[in-house]
UniProtKB/Swiss-Prot annotation:
Protein name: Acetylxylan esterase A
Lineage top rank: taxon: Eukaryota
Any one Pfam family match given in the protein's UniProt record, by short name: Esterase_PHB
Similarity comment text for this entry: Belongs to the carbohydrate esterase 1 (CE1) family. AxeA subfamily.
Species this chain originates from: Aspergillus oryzae (strain ATCC 42149 / RIB 40) (Yellow koji mold)
Top-rank EC class of the record's enzyme: hydrolase
Temperature effects on activity: Optimum temperature is 45 degrees Celsius. Unstable at 40 degrees Celsius with a half life of less than 60 minutes at 40 degrees Celsius and 10 minutes at 50 degrees Celsius.
């Protein structure tokens, strides 16, 4: 009887502890099919919140998409307002939704910390989310992607520059070049009117050097980039489309002034797609302002989930 009582007590404790781990330690076992917060994904120097969507039909060795919200946005808002969770159910990948810690919820794309590999800023926290998710779900490290809108697009370019080792591709919707919002006062979450208004204009080579300086010892492959922008954007002026495409053309060694092709009315009427090479496309949306539509099906093609 004593042995039986001991075993029952042990089993009850094990079940209780397991339930407590699931309840309190969402970082251990996030539920599939819903947006879940992960509270312990490792070092989080800038207090960015992590939310994750694990599909109900999770693939073996799944891919990962990091989907980064806009100013005033949240992980919940981007989860609801973007197509990535629905697409995850179709393709079996995991979606990470970071959430900015700042009032107004813009991202820090301005401090030296965030613009430096392992520098301790927002980019560092997001990179650690990727590392945790890859390990937790045995994800395919060659199928990790990043995308975002507005401030999230700025961070997309920053992530591609600071952690090129983590990402295979990125899609930026209405952003600016990596480093364009640099704060001379080293202020996180700073606004840069000169950049926003399209007045930060330089050469592809100079833009490339800014991106490459964010991880100066890196010599490996870099994520291919697709850049979307509205041609009547009055928040982040359309010149930022040109400058962002210049930056990645410089990084990949493409001649910015001699693209391989330009297609009209694609992916929809009055939009144009310019291709500089296999690693860089730009899509300029005619008549579209800052509120640019996410093209999830096009993203799936760029990320290699569909043909």
């Amino acid at each position: 009887m004593i042995l039986l009582s001991y075993l029952l007590t042990y089993l009850l404790c094990a079940l209780t502890c397991s339930a407590r781990a699931i309840h309190n330690g969402r970082s251990l076992i996030p539920r599939a099919g819903s947006l879940e917060q992960v509270t312990d994904f490792g070092d989080n120097p800038s207090n960015v919140k992590m939310y994750i969507y694990v599909p109900t039909n999770l693939a073996s060795n799944p891919g990962i998409i990091v989907a980064i919200h806009y100013c005033t946005g949240t992980a919940q808002a981007y989860y609801q307002g973007s197509p990535y969770a629905q697409l995850a159910e179709t393709h079996g990948f995991i979606v990470i939704y970071p959430e900015s810690p700042y009032e107004g919820t813009c991202w820090d794309v301005s401090s030296q910390a965030t613009l430096t590999h392992n520098g301790g800023g927002n980019s560092n926290s997001i990179a650690n989310m990727v590392t945790w998710t890859t390990k937790q779900y045995n994800a395919d490290s060659s199928k990790v992607f990043v995308t975002g809108t507005s401030s999230g697009a700025m961070m997309t370019n920053v992530m591609a520059a600071t952690y090129p080792n983590l990402f295979a591709a990125g899609v930026a919707y209405a952003g600016v070049p990596a480093g364009c919002f640099l704060s001379t006062a080293d202020q996180p979450d700073a606004w840069n009117s000169t950049c926003a208004q399209g007045q930060s204009i330089t050469t592809p080579e100079h833009w490339a050097s800014i991106a490459e300086a964010m991880y100066p010892d890196y010599s490996g492959s870099r994520p291919k980039m697709q850049i979307y922008h509205g041609n009547v954007d009055t928040t982040l002026y359309p010149q930022n489309y040109e400058e962002t495409c210049k930056q990645w053309a410089g990084v990949f060694g493409y001649n910015y002034d001699a693209p391989e092709s330009t297609e009209s009315n694609t992916p929809e009427a009055n939009w144009s797609r310019t291709t500089w090479g296999p690693n860089l496309q730009g899509i300029l949306a005619g008549g579209v302002g800052h509120n640019i539509q996410i093209h999830g099906d096009e993203d799936m093609k760029w990320f290699g989930f569909t043909n």
